[in-house]
Amino acid sequence: MSQTSTKVDMLNGPLFMKILIFALPLAASSLLQQLFNSVDVAVVGRFASSKALAAVGSNAPVISLLINLFVGISMGANVVLSNHLGQRDDEGVRRTVSTVSLVSVVSGVLLMLIGIGVSRPILELMDTPADVLDMAVLYLRLYFVGIPFFLIFNFGAAILRSVGDTRRPLYILVVAGVINTVLNLVLVICFGLGVEGVAIATAIANMFSAACIVVLLRREKGALQLQFNHMRIYGKELRRMLQIGVPAGLQGMVFSLSNVVVQSAINGYGSAAIAGSAAAVNFEYYCYYIIVACNGAAISFIGQNYGAGKYDRVRRIFRICMLMGLVGCFAANALFTWQNHFFLSFFTADPEVIRYGAIRMQGVLLFQFMACSYEISGSALRGMGESMSPTIMTVFGTCVLRMVWVFVVSPHYHGFAQLLQVYPLSWVLTGAMVLVAYHVRMKKLCAVRA
C-alpha cells in the first residue's frame, strides 16, 4: 500500500465516511493496545491465580496516572501538526516532527525511571493488600522498563494520524498483539513466570511496535520524514505542544488520580473485589476506546479545518464525531453488560470474583456512553487550540467529585455498588459543563467571522 493511499484529505469533500475510515483503525489500534493488558490479566487469572490477577489488575490506575501527562503531550503534537498542515506550512511540519521525535525519547526514559522508583510507595499508599503487594510491585517495575518504547510508538502514531494515516499503526499493533499473546502463554504456562512473564511479554511487544513506527517515519516523503541527522527540539513548536498537551495530560493525570482513590476504596473490599473490578475494567477500556477514536478524529479533522479557517466544517465534524461516539459506545456498553457473566469468565472462573465484576459492569459500564459528552467536546476545543478550559471543567466535574464521594459520601453508604455510583454522576456533571463551553466557543468564532 502506498503512503498516499493511507492519508485522508480532511479539508475538502464529504466528512462522514472520511471520519469513519479514520476512526475505525484508530479504535482498533487503541483496542489492541488495551488487549496487551487484557491478555496479561486473562493469562494470569486463568493460568496463575486470583491473587496474580489482582496484582496485575490493580496496577491499571497507577500506569494511567504516570503515562497520561506524556500521552497528553502527544495529543498536543497532533494538534500542532494538524494546524500546520491546514495552513500548508511544510517547514512547521518538519520542525514539529523533529521536536516530537526527540521529546518521545526523553519522555520515555524519564517516565521509566520515575515508574520504577515509585512503584512500591504508590502501591502501598493505595492500601494494596499484603498478599498481592510484592507481585504488583514486580509487575509494575518490569512494565515500566518497556515504557520508552510505548511512548515512541504513540508519538510516532500521532505524527501519522495528523495526515489521516491510522491504518499502518493498526497493522503494526496487530502483529505486536500476536507477539504479546504468544509470549504470555509461553512464559506463564511453559516457564511458570507468572506476573513477571506477562510484563516481559508486554515490554517486548512495545519494543517491536516502536521499531516499526520508526521505520515507517524514516520512509516517509517530504516534511513528515524522520531525519536523524537533523533532529533537534524547536522552542516554538515545543511551547505550542506543551500549551495544548500539558493541560490535557494533567487532566488525564488528575483523572487517573481520582481513579487511584476509587481503587484504594475498592481495595478495602478484599482481593475478590479487586480482581472482579480489574476484570470488569477491561470492558470499560474497550468501550472507552470507541470514544478515544472519535476524540482522535475530532482533534485531527478540527485541527486542520480550524487552521484553514473552515469553521462550518468544524461544527459538522463535531456533530458527526459525537453521534459516532454515542451510538458506538452505547452499543458496546449494552452488549458487554447483557452478557456480563460470559465475558467475565474469560478472565476468571472464581464465582465471587465474577459477582463483583458483574456489579461493576451493571453500575458503571452500562452508562459509560455518557462520557462522550465531555470527551468529544473537550477534544473539539483542543483541536481549536483551547486546552485549559476543558481541563479545568473535567478536573472539577469528574476528579474532585470522585474524591469527595470516596472520602465524604461513601463512608455513610457502605457497599461496593454504592461506591461505584460516582462514575455516572461525574460523567453527567462534567458533560453539561464542557458541552456549554464548546457551544460558547463556536458562537464566538462565528461572530468574529461575521
Regions found by a protein language model. Give the residues of each.
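Small-residue-rich hydrophobic transmembrane alpha-helices
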Residues: L53-L113, F150-P169, Q263, G276-A334, ...
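N-terminal transmembrane alpha-helices
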Residues: M10-F47, P61-G76, V80, V105-M112, ...
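Transmembrane helical elements of multi-pass membrane transporters/channels
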Residues: I21-D40, L142, A176, A205-S209, ...
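Residue-level signal for transmembrane alpha-helical positions in Major Facilitator Superfamily
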Residues: L20, L24, F36, I73, ...
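Short runs within selected transmembrane alpha-helices of multi-pass transporters and secretion channels
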Residues: S74, L142-R161, P169-N180, V198-I213, ...
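Helix-terminus/linker motif at the lipid-water interface of multi-pass membrane proteins
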Residues: L31, L35-A54, L123-A130, V186-L193, ...
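Small-residue hotspots at the loop-to-helix junctions and early N-terminal turns
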Residues: A48-P61, L140, A199, S271-Y286, ...
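Short alpha-helical transmembrane segments in multi-pass integral membrane proteins
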Residues: M1-A23, L81-G146, I179, C190-V246, ...
